[in-house]
C-alpha cells in the first residue's frame, strides 16, 4: 500500500490536503491501496497552529469523496496514536461518534489473491433475546474470518468472528422477532468476501 504523509490542512493555501490526495491518486496507476497519513498529532498539540479535531474528521470525509472512487483511496492512517489514545482535543470522541461510528472490514487485496472463499451455509435458532447462528464452511479454500450482519428492526449491525468459531450468538435489543435478516460471508486472509449466505425468518 501507499501511505503518503499528507499533514497539511484542507484549507492550506499552498498544499491543501484534498489537492495533494488527488495528485497521489493520479499517480496510483496500479490502483493499489492508497491510505494517506493524516496529522492527528497536531490536534490540540499546544503549538501556535494546532488542528481542531474537526480537521481530521473532515480529512477522513475527503478520502471518501466520490471523485476518488476507483483510484485506490480506500482508507487513511492517523499519525500518531497519542492523540487518539488520550482523546486529545476530543478527537477520539468525535471520530467514534461520527466518521468511525460504524465498524468496517479492511478492503480486499485482490492482486495478492483474487479468488474469494466459498460461501458458508447457516442455520439459525432462536431463544430468549438472542439468536444462535451455526456456520458451516463451504468446500474449498479455507476462510480466516466470518463477517456476520443482521438487521434488528431498522438497524443493520455487523461483527467479525474468527473462522474457528462455528457458532455465534446475536443479541437483539428490539427482540428476536425484530430480526428479519442475517447475512454471513466467509473472508479470506486478504479480505476477499464470499457470496452471501442469507437467512430470513421462515427460511
Regions of interest found by a model, annotated:
Residues 1-14, 24-111:
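Substrate-binding cleft of secreted/luminal carbohydrate-active enzymes
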Residues 189-203:
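Extracellular fibronectin type III
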Residues 114-123:
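Proline-enriched interdomain boundary motifs that mark the N-terminal boundary
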Residues 129-141:
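Conserved aromatic anchor
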Residues 173-193:
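Beta-strand-rich modules
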Residues 166-170:
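Short strand-edge motifs at loop-to-beta-strand transitions and within beta-strands
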Residues 138-153, 158, 179:
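Solvent-exposed loop/turn segments flanking beta-strands in beta-repeat/beta-sandwich domains
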Residues 159-165:
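Short beta-strand segments within Ig-like beta-sandwich modules, predominantly Fibronectin type-III
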Amino acid at each position: 500500500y501507499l501511505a503518503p504523509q499528507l499533514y497539511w490542512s484542507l484549507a492550506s493555501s499552498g498544499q491543501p490536503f484534498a489537492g495533494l490526495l488527488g495528485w497521489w491518486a493520479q499517480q496510483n496507476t496500479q490502483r493499489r491501496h492508497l491510505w494517506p497519513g493524516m496529522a492527528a498529532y497536531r490536534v490540540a498539540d499546544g503549538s501556535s497552529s494546532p488542528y481542531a479535531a474537526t480537521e481530521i474528521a473532515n480529512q477522513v470525509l475527503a478520502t471518501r469523496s466520490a471523485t476518488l472512487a476507483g483510484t485506490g483511496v480506500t482508507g487513511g492512517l492517523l499519525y500518531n496514536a497519542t492523540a487518539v489514545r488520550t482523546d486529545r482535543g476530543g478527537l477520539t470522541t468525535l471520530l467514534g461518534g461520527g466518521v468511525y461510528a460504524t465498524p468496517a472490514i479492511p478492503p480486499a487485496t485482490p492482486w495478492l489473491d483474487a479468488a474469494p472463499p466459498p460461501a458458508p451455509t447457516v442455520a439459525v435458532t432462536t431463544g430468549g433475546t438472542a439468536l444462535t447462528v451455526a456456520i458451516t464452511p463451504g468446500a474449498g479454500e479455507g476462510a480466516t474470518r466470518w463477517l456476520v450482519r443482521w438487521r434488528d428492526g431498522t438497524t443493520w449491525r455487523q461483527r467479525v468472528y474468527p473462522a474457528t468459531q462455528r457458532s455465534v450468538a446475536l443479541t437483539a435489543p428490539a427482540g428476536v422477532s425484530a430480526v428479519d435478516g442475517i447475512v454471513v460471508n466467509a473472508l479470506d486472509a486478504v479480505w476477499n468476501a464470499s457470496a452471501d449466505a442469507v437467512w430470513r425468518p421462515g427460511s
